[in-house]
């Protein structure tokens, strides 16, 4: 199955502690997970590494989210939407299912 979401797509979180918030896909991981910029933050306890001059402490970083828990954001309606594929001029393009407009 082709992955319908791509890097730098605007998405909305459907479930979890950040439900309803919007963000941009920063990275796509294996196992159908993505990292959304600034959302699903976790606190990681970092040990100090004196040999590399790294100080320890608590850092915040983005955790992966499964693709079933996010949806692409349609900029016209400002709501979550579904994605479809079609061929235009010999190229496979993505489009919004609700409006039929192609995704840039």
From Swiss-Prot:
Part of the 50S ribosomal subunit. The gene is rplX. Pfam families: KOW (PF00467), ribosomal_L24 (PF17136). Keywords: Ribonucleoprotein, Ribosomal protein, RNA-binding, rRNA-binding. GO terms for biological process: translation. CDD domains: KOW_RPL26. GO terms for cellular component: ribonucleoprotein complex; ribosome. PROSITE patterns: RIBOSOMAL_L24. One of two assembly initiator proteins, it binds directly to the 5'-end of the 23S rRNA, where it nucleates assembly of the 50S subunit. This is Large ribosomal subunit protein uL24. SUPFAM superfamilies: Translation proteins SH3-like domain (SSF50104). Belongs to the universal ribosomal protein uL24 family. InterPro entries: KOW, Rib_uL2_dom2, Ribosomal_uL24, Ribosomal_uL24_CS, Ribosomal_uL24_KOW, Translation_prot_SH3-like_sf. NCBIfam families: rplX_bact.
